[in-house]
């Protein structure tokens, strides 16, 4: 009779039947076969593969062990079994995507039923096995595939990937000074050419607070003709659309400010660090200076939507769910 078993990695398949012929019809890799006689003793232990037949050995039960999770098929009985090579055509197709994060990580687990996997990454990606390593951007034991290049994996073993060692995600870098802006809505800020970028909040962060940060520099000494020791107040902030990028309502997020009680700024670096709670999907972010200082108006005629004394050097996040470098598209075929 033909026996079909679905086994987990390390599992045994045992069949109690008298016979003297055994044929492995379907299997991936090596199996360990044990055959037992009428007295319960082990009459045979050997490694077998797909297509192997053992004839003329009397047994009352057989046991097969696999190192891989897979479906196996075998013949046990007195009659001989005529083996025919199994088709390699796929019977199951599944598509999904994998978030690409920092470090060497698993892309595909070991899967004995996997026939092939077609993969496309939006960023340069290195592919390798369990021995692949990466240190300071140098990858050993992996092959590079260019961004947008589709490639196939035809092995059933585990597959690792590497795209970056960066543990943060930089959304935007700026060299120009931020503009002064009040919360007058998205349309008004865009009409006045306030710089922005879009952030795509994943479903896992829908309504969940996450950290959004910026390295911020304030420099006012001698800028735009301002006196070297003029006191200037600052309060950098993010204005973020409440809904998607077409929503006009903006939410203000800020974490620090300084009133003009000092003798001017000269490369005073700070970190704007806020906890943001947004719905899943795309939101528009405006990094702005919200404090229009009296002296800036009186001495150098600054006004709303002019360049301020504040520069957002880079806006970034170290939240694990936002440090995704992209999503690999995978089409999986199984036998």
Swiss-Prot record:
Transmembrane segments: none annotated. It is found in: Virion. Keywords: Virion. GO terms for cellular component: virion component. Pfam families: Phage_spike_P1, Spike_JR1, Spike_JR2. It comes from the Viruses. The C-terminus is responsible for receptor binding activity. The N-terminus is associated with the capsid vertex. This is Spike protein P1. It comes from Pseudoalteromonas phage PM2 (Bacteriophage PM2).
